[in-house]
Regions:
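Juxtamembrane intracellular "pre-TM" segments in multi-pass secondary transporters
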Residues: 6-19, 217-284
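Helix-to-loop junctions at the C-terminal end of transmembrane segments
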Residues: 78-91, 328-341, 426
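Helix-loop junctions at membrane interfaces in 12-TM secondary transporters
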Residues: 112-124, 361-372
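Multi-pass alpha-helical transporter architecture, strongest
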Residues: 203-214, 437-464
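Structural signature of the two symmetry-related core transmembrane helices
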Residues: 95-109, 344-359
Length: 464
């Protein structure tokens, strides 16, 4: 537990204007996340499946959609660390962040006007790539907008407001879908899509405006700091030559050299994590395991209901219910972070998810599905928020973009291994209940690695 003096200091502070502006971006991007989870797959199939020219079967549509997600995941994982490292070097994080948001929002709105399923998937992948890139910069901004003792609470506010705020544009999008040809038939499928994507894109952009205006990058890598970071890796030809080239001039480097410098720094950081920053390395392993379990459950929630032949409308209602519970859960754990260590709360969240996985063995009706949704909501946002804030505390703030780029690789892997496990269980003849229950292994092993990270000597920049 933390000292009473620390608790008193934290309780006397409300969200500052910078913290509030940062939190609002979660409200914007979460709207797109919810749309992508609930309606985009449906709209994709409405364009792809049929007997018309260029249309395909439902199974092939599902397969192509999965391929699109895989492509998006790989590209996002590759460019994330490079984008973060460039922003750290050049003190231009705000400019690059703004660019990713504007392109992402524009692509989101354009998605509603696509006439074919192929173009729909191409624009969807483009939107998701820029959306994911924006999150690298956004997460790394946490070290600039607040202090270390408030990171848990501010990060939790971001997820909480995001879960709640995302329901507003989603309800409009859902109403447009209900009025479409699949249900009431009042409007065309094209108009339903245009409304859904446009409302989400506009919402995403408008709530980001305060962050555009208020954010200032405080932590960044100077030339001197950059040399210090690489001094232990000068035996590497690529890094050594890059440093020599950089020292020839004080002018801003060109784009290609900037990218080369960023790649060199990433290799140096990976070496540093492996050899010196082992606390960060152990946490990243733990994070990859338990967040993979989280992502798998989220991505397969509709499949769970479908396999159990549950009412589709009831599933959507419980999806919204989960958003509200996740909002409350994030706020509760944010308050608890004033009293308890971040790692203690992470243990609770991981244990909670472990219990949810075991509960899946008893799941057989819509009520049980709702109980499981409640359990997921209690810990979903809290686990994500506390992981983000804990990582912010144990990394050097001037390299936050670069470190969060690496963090993003692990986050983007969420549901990769878990989905393979679920597929293997299903192909072997197992039920969806058993498949979800196997996710408990990911949380158990992740718990062990988090314990190892927690016990490891903290680096100088940690203040947990």
């Amino acid at each position: 537990m933390k000292s009473k003096e620390d608790n008193t200091q934290k309780k006397t502070k409300k969200l500052s204007s910078k913290e509030l502006s940062w939190v609002l971006y979660d409200v914007g991007n979460s709207a797109y996340t919810l749309l992508a989870c609930a309606l985009i797959p449906i709209w994709h199939k409405s364009l792809a499946v049929g007997d018309g020219a260029g249309q395909i079967s439902s199974d092939r549509a599902t397969a192509y959609y999965a391929v699109a997600i895989a492509v998006m995941t790989v590209v996002s994982a590759l460019i994330g660390p490079v984008c973060g490292a460039i922003a750290d070097h050049m003190r231009i994080k705000k400019a690059i962040f703004s660019t990713t948001v504007v392109v992402g929002v524009s692509a989101c709105i354009l998605n509603g006007f696509t006439p074919t399923w192929v173009l729909f998937l191409v624009i969807y992948v483009l939107t998701k790539i820029f959306y994911n890139a924006s999150l690298v910069f956004y997460d790394s901004m946490l070290v600039d907008v607040t202090t270390k003792d408030r990171m848990d609470e501010v990060s939790s506010y971001g997820y909480a407001w995001g879960y709640l705020g995302s329901c507003v544009p989603f309800l409009v999008s859902l109403a447009a879908y209900i009025c479409g040809p699949d249900m009431l038939g009042y409007i065309s499928n094209r108009l339903s899509m245009i409304i859904g994507f446009a409302v989400t894109g506009i919402w995403w952009f408008v709530v980001t405006i305060p962050l555009f205006k208020s954010y200032k990058q405080v932590n960044y890598v100077s030339d001197a700091a950059d040399k210090d970071i690489h001094k232990n890796f000068e035996n590497d030809v690529f890094i050594r030559d890059n440093i020599k080239e950089k020292n020839k001039t004080n002018k801003n480097p060109g784009v290609l050299r900037l990218i080369a410098d960023a790649v060199a720094q990433i290799f140096g950081t990976i070496k540093k994590i492996a050899t010196k920053d082992k606390k960060v390395g152990l946490f990243l392993v733990a994070f990859f395991l338990y967040i993979d379990g989280v992502g798998t459950i989220i991505d397969n929630c509709i499949n769970i209901g479908t396999d159990l032949k549950l009412d589709s409308v009831g599933q959507v209602v419980f999806l919204l219910f989960t958003q509200i519970v996740a909002c409350i859960g994030s706020l509760v754990f944010g308050r608890l972070s004033q009293t308890y260590k971040t790692t203690t709360l992470l243990y609770v969240c991981i244990a909670g998810y472990f219990a949810v996985c075991l509960y899946a063995l008893t799941l057989h009706d819509l009520i049980g599905f709702g109980i499981m949704a409640f359990g997921v909501g209690c810990f979903q946002g809290s686990l994500q928020a506390l992981s983000r804030s804990y990582f912010s505390k144990i990394i050097p703030p001037e390299n936050s973009g670069e470190y969060f780029g690496i963090y993003d690789i692990f986050a983007k892997g969420a549901s990769f291994l878990g989905s393979l496990v679920i597929a293997a269980v299903k192909l072997a003849g197992g039920t969806i209940n058993v498949a979800v229950a196997t996710m408990a292994i990911f949380f158990a092993v992740g718990f062990v690695f988090l314990r190892l990270a927690d016990r490891y000597d903290a680096p100088r920049h940690e203040n947990n």
